Amino acid sequence: MLEVVTVRIPRRFGFHPIRDIQVLTPMNRGGLGAHALNEDLRGRLNAAAEPRLTRFGSTFAPGDKVIQMVNNYDREVFNGDIGFVREIDLEEGRMNMDFDGRCVTCEFGELDEVSLAYAVSIHKSQGSEYPVVVIPLVMQHYTLLERNLLYTAITRGKKLVVIVGQPRALALAVRNRRASRRITGLAQRLRTFKAGSEENH
């Protein structure tokens, strides 16, 4: 999965691994949860950045991709906004971030409002769109594998969507209509996509 995000998609399609590619995962915890994937992806994409700052269980460095976790009307950044760490000022106790070309400054004591965003939960991605979405699906996530969650993840991608994982987990997600019956045609679209991709290989 890490190689798909950091090497294969950028090399084959020309997308930037940090700016363009968003990993969306069903869970926050576990080996393929957002927390572990954020550390793994940062290790591949931004390992050498300094200085590093750890607050509220998260470590930040210049160049890191971050997500705003709550609405902050004073700073005009809102839940789900994606930005990038510009600078960490250890003397002043502030971290400067770039949200859509706008500099937003956060005091170290307020960094519980921000989290790493190389990978985010599918739930957290609702309402957002990204050029490329990569979705890890494994049976470890079985309690959350539902058709509406898969639909949400797939529809976040504007140009390319890549599902990485176990076919059994994908089949379970497509079959499982526990939460909603309003989504139609997803199973057929995935079968058509799979048939088309097999013909191209």
Question: What residues fall within each predicted segment?
Answer:
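Conserved helicase motor core of P-loop NTPases
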Residues: 1-75, 86, 95
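C-terminal accessory regions
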Residues: 79-201
